[in-house]
């Protein structure tokens, strides 16, 4: 099962920069983007654990240069039930949300 990497920023421009850095830094797939409200935005990537860690590290650095980084997290083995509640693309759904 693939890991799930997430980055949350305040502001869309920082999230776009972070997302670009993530997919360029490691072999990950961008599986979702969510605008939460209050300026908060989250991007989610899937890949192996090392790739998600490298991607989120690069994305976090990029987001901090452009705007405000709020949170970064990697879940090594997300449970399959998460897909029923959260838009994390566990079954190959790569649409941006």
Curated annotation (Swiss-Prot):
SMART domains: BMC. It comes from the Bacteria. Residues 3-87 form the BMC domain. The keyword Metal-binding does not apply. Signal peptide: none annotated. It is found in: Bacterial microcompartment. NCBIfam families: PRK15474.1. Homohexamer with a central pore of up to 8.6 Angstroms diameter. The hexamers pack into a two-dimensional array. Interacts with EutQ. Belongs to the bacterial microcompartments protein family. This is Bacterial microcompartment shell protein EutM. The lineage of its organism: Bacteria, Pseudomonadati, Pseudomonadota, Gammaproteobacteria, Enterobacterales.
């Amino acid at each position: 099962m693939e890991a799930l990497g997430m980055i949350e920023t305040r502001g869309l421009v920082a999230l776009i920069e972070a997302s670009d850095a993530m997919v360029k830094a490691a072999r990950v797939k961008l599986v979702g983007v969510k605008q939460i409200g209050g300026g908060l935005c989250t991007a989610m990537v899937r890949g192996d654990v090392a790739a998600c860690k490298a991607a989120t590290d690069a994305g976090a650095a990029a987001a901090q240069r452009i705007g405000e980084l709020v949170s970064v997290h990697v879940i090594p083995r997300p449970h399959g039930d998460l897909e029923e509640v959260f838009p994390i693309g566990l079954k190959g759904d790569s649409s941006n949300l």
